[in-house]
Amino acid sequence: MQNGSNAQKIHETLEKKGKEMTFHTFLIKYGEIGIKGKNRYLFEDALVNQIKFALKDVDGEFDVYKTQGRIYVDCSEFYDYEEAVESLQRVFGIVGICPVVRLKDQGFDQLKADVVAYMDEMYEDKKKTFKVEARRSRKNYPKNSMEINCDLGEVILDAFPEIRVDVHHPDILLNVEIREDIYLYSQIIPGPGGMPIGTNGKAMLLLSGGIDSPVAGYMVSRRGVGLEATYFHAPPYTSERAKQKVVDLAKLVSKYAGPIKLHIVNFTDIQLYIYDKCPHDELTIIMRRYMMKIAEHFAKEDECLGMITGESIGQVASQTMQSLLVTNEVCTLPVYRPLIGMDKSDIVKISEKIDTYETSILPFEDCCTIFVAKHPVTRPNLKRIIKSEENLEEKIDELYAEAIHTVETIVVS
């Protein structure tokens, strides 16, 4: 039961705090980083830097730091809470974002009052179950974790008769962390998971204006891989609007993956030459092979460790197992295809989640659709394809070099 001084302190705290709870600290929870052993600090430092980058355009001032195995974000008095949370939800490596009430240690009676005020302000409906979970990293604190749990639970039950304890599946899990200061939180906003960008190298994404390739870039970057991208432009057959669409897609992906170096390759002359010299049922696969060659050139030049495509088995003629085998033959870098076993509906769901879908379906054709054959080969034979490419030997090296030389490179973020 509450004694008179406790009840008075709770009343004074409720009066002081009113009904306007604001959060000026976020506790950042991460997953796999916690099991990285001796290299853990490298992943933590990368995550801190990614958080700083994500918040740089958010209204307000933010201090991001790590201490005692935790990452915190301290916020200025006035900042955009919703925008800050949305930005943090795009940082790979974060599994949870906890809005925290940070308190100075003014004794246990004051902590009781603050906990009651927190529960009162956070939960209008008190017909819930709860559990208190205390962590005490400050070992000289006068109570141990079990005593803190029991005493704070008792004061909550006294203050709100309709609330009940459930230690197994509570509606509210009130976390109390006793450090130099005291941290209260009960909400965990989900993050995207994964690993911080750049902790697993860099790869080259073949980016088109379609639905699949932006999703492929997102999925690989989620594992800590930085992205560059190559886009094949075919003026005048593809418009400036088609090119801008791809730039816009790169910007959307960069919200998660960080700045993306985008190589825009003029592919028109190569496409026309292949169209003129090669069997039309093999156009798609031969053009695809030259796209891979050119993208790999830039990948190696910028020390990428692999290539990324949005291919899924059997989705179109160039994505059968035989076609992928023939396409791979021109590459020495590994080719990562994160969508390889996914249905189109699953890919669309991810594109909607990362906000690329509406841009991807804008009706501007890219070079892959302009020169498509009516009846493309679905089971290409590698020897036959190489034989057909011999028809290109007179001029293809010159056109390849010209495409490399005239590339337009921009950085989008």
Predicted regions: what is each one?
Residues G210:
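Conserved G/P- and acidic residue-centered "switch" motifs that form tight phosphate/ATP-binding loops
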Residues G4-M204, P214-I260, D269, E301, ...:
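RNA-binding accessory domains that recognize and position tRNA/RNA substrates
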Residues E358, L362-S413:
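The feature marks non-catalytic terminal segments
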Residues E154-I156, G193-N200, Q271-L272, D276-I354, ...:
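Active-site adenylate/phosphate-handling loop in enzymes that bind or generate adenylated species
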Residues G69, V265-I270, S312, E365-A373:
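A glycine-rich phosphate-binding loop feature that marks nucleotide/adenosyl-phosphate handling sites
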Residues L205, A229-Y231, I264, T309, ...:
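Structural beta-sheet core signal
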